[in-house]
């Protein structure tokens, strides 16, 4: 969870009222934070805020916390208002960036009065949003520049690796390749672009470099100081919705410091947009649902008042609430999310506890204990556990795995359930990247390896996780199966090394098994087999096909296996 430092004096300046340290401990709860530490430095009191919500990047700075508290205390109600003035600035996006880092969104914020604490919060917000929400700059990277040093129009273009500029913190030019090799940020984030044919570059009309997203800003325009009055904000990434949200978070935080927001026209090869877009989002909720789940006898008017203190605009109609909420939020997906805000405004400490009417005695789930035992076993074999997302997409599950499914479902076939021919897909996904539930785990491990090619080898991974399969006999038409997957990556890895770990698993769990040679496009022919226990095929083992490794951008050989855990579930776990 994000942690960051804030000044008590700065928070109180933004809220408009002073409080004791004890009062601040309670106030932080309105912003879904806990007060982790308090200390004094040069006569100033500082807090370490520990955010408890990874879906609210708008609360990861002093500006966001202060805004939330102002509304929660009733100093303001309803939607926060931000005006956007249209500028004549245009950013042109190069078509060559489509497969490199396709999306950039931009804004101008003018009239800032930046002191040292405001500058520290600006840098903190950049770093926390890019690190956590942006997954270490892979999905979101942020640049803030001194706009007075920039000459529009601006170009987000593909650059040759031999082009030069002075990176932030240096006083001499370096080529883009040299930056990735020698600059601290280049070594840290260069793996995100180093294998691309071109590198992204943001330049103005005079050819002056602003930044090399997502790695480093230029020294010329990318150093913001307390003397800076007008800034240009740049957000790049792979998902347009995600970079738009990050832009909304940053510009509204700067507006809390008195800045005036101006929009920028962004011209893509096949469409144009004006950014930022702060149009409020909409949602509807049944008031009786709120009352029932809250367990509180709240009137319609009380629910309305509580929601207005959480930055909603509320219209009551036919026992329902039509809601509009700020564009810097993207976490309202269900009525329960609205209920959470109602309870935060009401105050969890104000809810009277009740003793359960039915005495129950809990115990651990036996199958979960079995899964934990398997995890301990794998750690004992020297493997590192990873926990990846259940949500994925068809490309990752089939296309990148060299399987003939893609968009043509009729071409799919069942590779002894690794993977099955059918994929559970989401009807209206928020992002194409998260458009399906995975039906096998090896692609998730390869994705992890592809994101860590800059780390040392060998890399030996395992995951105990869920795969979702079609099952027409069930009410939901699906079933989630627990599986074990292992991936080994280093220059000398072989089928035998993976087989030795598989043998260790079977021996410790008390099972005899057989391997039967099989055909599977994800693996090298002749080096792949079915895992058979009690006459039933429960998994697959083999060396990953070079075409698959190339699809994932992995340069090391990989051996892997995957199997269902349920057939191995016996005493003493039953």
Swiss-Prot record:
Mg(2+) binds at residues 331, 337, 340-341. NCBIfam families: pheT_arch. It is an enzyme of class 6 (ligase). Keywords: Aminoacyl-tRNA synthetase, ATP-binding, Cytoplasm, Ligase, Magnesium, Metal-binding, Nucleotide-binding, Protein biosynthesis. The gene is pheT. It comes from the Archaea. The keyword ATP-binding applies. It comes from Thermococcus kodakarensis (strain ATCC BAA-918 / JCM 12380 / KOD1) (Pyrococcus kodakaraensis (strain KOD1)). This is Phenylalanine--tRNA ligase beta subunit. GO terms for biological process: phenylalanyl-tRNA aminoacylation.
């Amino acid at each position: 969870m994000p942690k960051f430092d804030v000044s008590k004096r700065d928070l109180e300046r933004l809220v408009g009222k002073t409080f004791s340290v004890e009062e601040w401990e309670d106030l932080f709860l309105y912003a879904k934070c806990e007060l982790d530490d308090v200390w004094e430095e040069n006569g100033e009191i500082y807090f370490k805020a520990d955010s408890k919500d990874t879906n609210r990047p708008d609360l990861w700075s002093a500006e966001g916390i202060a805004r939330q508290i102002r509304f929660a205390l009733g100093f303001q109600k309803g939607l926060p208002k931000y005006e956007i003035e249209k500028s004549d600035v245009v950013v042109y996006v190069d078509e060559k960036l489509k497969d490199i880092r396709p999306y950039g969104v931009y804004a101008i914020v003018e009239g800032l009065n930046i002191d040292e604490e405001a500058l520290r919060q600006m840098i903190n917000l950049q770093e926390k949003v890019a690190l956590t929400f942006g997954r270490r700059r892979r999905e979101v990277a942020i640049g803030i520049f001194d706009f007075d040093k920039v000459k529009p129009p601006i170009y987000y273009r593909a650059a040759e690796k031999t082009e030069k500029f002075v990176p932030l913190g240096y006083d001499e030019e370096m080529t883009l390749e040299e930056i990735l090799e020698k600059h601290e940020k280049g070594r840290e984030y260069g793996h995100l672009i180093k294998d691309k044919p071109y590198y992204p570059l943001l330049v103005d009309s005079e050819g002056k470099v602003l930044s090399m997203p997502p790695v480093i800003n230029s020294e010329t325009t990318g150093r913001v100081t307390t003397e800076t009055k007008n800034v240009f904000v740049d957000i790049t990434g792979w998902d347009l919705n995600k970079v738009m949200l990050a832009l909304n978070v940053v510009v509204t935080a700067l507006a809390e410091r008195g800045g005036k927001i101006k929009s920028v026209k962004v011209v893509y090869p096949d469409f144009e947009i004006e950014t930022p877009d702060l149009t409020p989002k909409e949602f509807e909720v049944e008031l009786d649902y709120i009352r029932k789940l809250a367990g509180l006898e709240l009137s319609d008017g009380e629910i309305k008042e509580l929601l207005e203190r959480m930055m909603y605009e509320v219209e009551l109609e036919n026992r329902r609430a039509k809601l509009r909420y700020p564009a810097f939020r993207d976490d309202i997906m269900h009525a329960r999310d609205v209920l959470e805000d109602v309870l935060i405004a009401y105050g969890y400490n104000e809810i009277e506890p009740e003793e359960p009417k039915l005495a129950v005695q809990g115990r651990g789930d036996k199958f979960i204990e079995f899964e934990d035992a398997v995890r301990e076993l794998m750690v004992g074999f020297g493997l590192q556990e990873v926990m990846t997302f259940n949500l994925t997409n068809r490309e990752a599950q089939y296309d990148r795995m060299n399987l003939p499914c893609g968009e043509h479902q009729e071409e799919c076939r069942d590779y002894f359930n690794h993977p099955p021919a059918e994929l559970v897909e989401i009807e209206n996904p928020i992002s194409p990247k998260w458009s399906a539930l995975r039906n096998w785990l090896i692609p998730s491990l390869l994705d992890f390896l592809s994101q860590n090619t800059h780390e040392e080898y060998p890399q030996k991974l395992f995951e105990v996780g869920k795969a979702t399969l079609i099952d027409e006999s069930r009410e939901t038409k699906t079933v989630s199966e627990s599986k074990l997957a292992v991936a080994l990556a280093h220059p000398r890895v072989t089928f035998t090394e993976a087989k030795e770990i598989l043998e260790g698993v079977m021996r410790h769990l008390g099972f005899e098994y057989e391997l039967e040679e099989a055909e599977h496009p994800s693996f090298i022919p002749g080096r792949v087999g079915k895992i058979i226990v009690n006459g039933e095929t429960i998994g697959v083992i083999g060396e990953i096909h070079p075409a698959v490794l190339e699809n994932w951008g992995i340069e090391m050989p990989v051996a892997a296996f995957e199997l269902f855990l349920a057939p191995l579930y016996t005493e003493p776990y039953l």
